[in-house]
């Protein structure tokens, strides 16, 4: 990306659902997008903001600066069909939201990230992460992105998964996986694999389970050991919450 119009075009293609996350080359987007004051009177260059605020006070108007950022909020430009967004400031332009998606107040969706729909989002979907249909991100749940920390593995979350409250993942999940509340799975996390009798079969790093389906990640309440066994109960979203968006 070498120009601001090209950057905005690609963000719109994503948010209009014409292309999915990670399908466009977004290299250079940060350099191409200027830092903007997003205000109640529209976007403004930062250099023009002090004069605009002073003029508003003189004229008895209130000029609200909702953010200072390179990315505007999604709903200033695009409102996808069939979605609910409880707090529009939590979803950036460039997010991909499939029909039936609900983003609650503490949910967050970055650009070049999103959901297939229907989905419940009460946690954070980082840049580059795509979540398949039927999956629930619990309150303050987290998915590892590639913008900081040196990681370059793009995370995908399969269908009918549950990342419980305050949990998170730095590996991709297949379908019907569950991570218990408060447990963050990083690629280097030591995981004990359990058989159907609850006996440890082997211990490995979580990255070796990357993308596999039907896994249940739990932490032993006495030893703190992270364990993984077959997930025998896939989650199901509350249809009433998503069919009438």
Regions found by a protein language model. Name each.
Residues 161, 183, 204, 211-213:
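Catalytic or ion-translocation cores adjacent to nucleophile or general acid/base/metal-coordination motifs
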Residues 188-208:
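A conserved acidic, glycine/proline-rich C-terminal tail/linker
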Residues 68-91:
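Active-site-adjacent loop/helix segments that line or gate small-molecule/cofactor pockets in enzymes
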Residues 1-76, 207-245:
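Terminal amphipathic alpha-helical/low-complexity segments used for targeting or macromolecular assembly
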Residues 174-176, 191-192, 231-232:
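Composition- and surface-driven signal marking solvent-exposed, interaction-prone regions
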Residues 83, 89-91, 95-97, 101-103, ...:
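A structural motif detector for beta-strand N-caps
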């Amino acid at each position: 990306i070498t120009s601001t119009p090209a950057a905005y075009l690609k963000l719109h293609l994503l948010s209009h659902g014409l292309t999915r996350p990670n399908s466009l080359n977004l290299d250079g987007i940060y350099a191409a997008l200027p830092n903007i004051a997003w205000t109640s009177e529209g976007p403004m260059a930062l250099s023009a903001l002090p004069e605009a605020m002073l003029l508003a006070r003189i004229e008895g108007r209130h000029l609200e600066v909702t953010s200072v950022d390179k990315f505007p909020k999604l709903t200033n430009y695009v409102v996808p069909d069939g979605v609910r967004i409880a707090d529009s400031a939590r979803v950036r332009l460039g997010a991909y939201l499939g029909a039936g998606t609900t983003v609650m107040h503490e949910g967050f969706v970055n650009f070049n990230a999103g959901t297939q729909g229907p989905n419940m989002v009460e946690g954070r979907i980082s840049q580059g992460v795509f979540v398949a249909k039927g999956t629930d991100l619990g309150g303050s749940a987290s998915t590892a992105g590639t913008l900081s920390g040196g990681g370059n593995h793009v995370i995908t979350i399969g269908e009918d998964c549950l990342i419980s409250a305050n949990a998170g993942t730095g590996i991709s999940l297949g379908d019907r996986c569950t991570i218990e509340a408060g447990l963050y799975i990083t690629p280097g996390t030591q995981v004990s694999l359990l058989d159907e009798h609850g006996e440890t079969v082997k211990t490995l790093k979580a990255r070796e389970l990357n993308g596999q389906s039907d896994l249940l990640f739990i932490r032993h309440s006495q030893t703190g050991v992270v364990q993984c066994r077959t997930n025998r109960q896939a989650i199901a979203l509350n249809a009433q919450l998503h069919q009438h968006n």
